[in-house]
Amino acid sequence: MDELGFHRTLHRPGTLLDVGAHEGGFTLPLAALPGSRVLAFEPLPESFARLRAAAGQLAHVTLRQEALGDATGEAVLRLPVVEGVANAQWASLAKRYDGFGPQVGERRVTVPLRRLDEFGLDDLTAVKLDAEGAEYEVLRGAVETLRRCRPVLSIEIEERHRPGSTWAVPAFLDALGYDAFWEHWGAWRPMAEFDRATMQVASADPSVFAASDPYVFVFYVLPREQAPAMLDRLRRAEAGAVSPPAP
């Protein structure tokens, strides 16, 4: 099951949060789910312009040209520039790219920074989070919302983006009453079975993913009080016994 399948299977009407929306590749499928209202954050101006062109006419989609974190104000977003070409998909608040080599530099963009808790959401049912190493800060700024709404989450976490993040983020969520899982070939495994020493070997070289089999970087996080029932639904969906909601 892929990340979108996870959200389709566990979909409940309400607000769906897309953090790191980029150009809308996840925003639009979320918006197609019945009874959904999507709140999408993308701070990079050029990516936000494409996101707005793709989804800006949808009345139930709200787009914010802001970054999320654990403070309010401004932050510096860094993009790697290789051979003079900037890579928007790797834009990060947590990483620095200058010094990687003679042909690698970085472009810096100052962006607005908000905490999710400022928005006072009371119907958040799902979160997709891809913040290129800043996931911990995003979650710290969302504690009140997570406690109040108990959404499900899918989070990309990689040691190559931020060393220590594969234990720090799940530990933070564990303290909030959440359990993290990863999936491989239909098997849903607890975070305790994740081996960062063998399952993220590509952290040493971002261009080589074959070094880990599997390379695990998407983690699925469930409210502890609902985890058994949700895992059962996910497993039955993998087996074809549960159909996702029709758009």
What are these regions (language model features)?
Residues M1-P247:
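Phosphate/nucleotide-binding beta-alpha loop and adjacent structural elements of enzyme active sites
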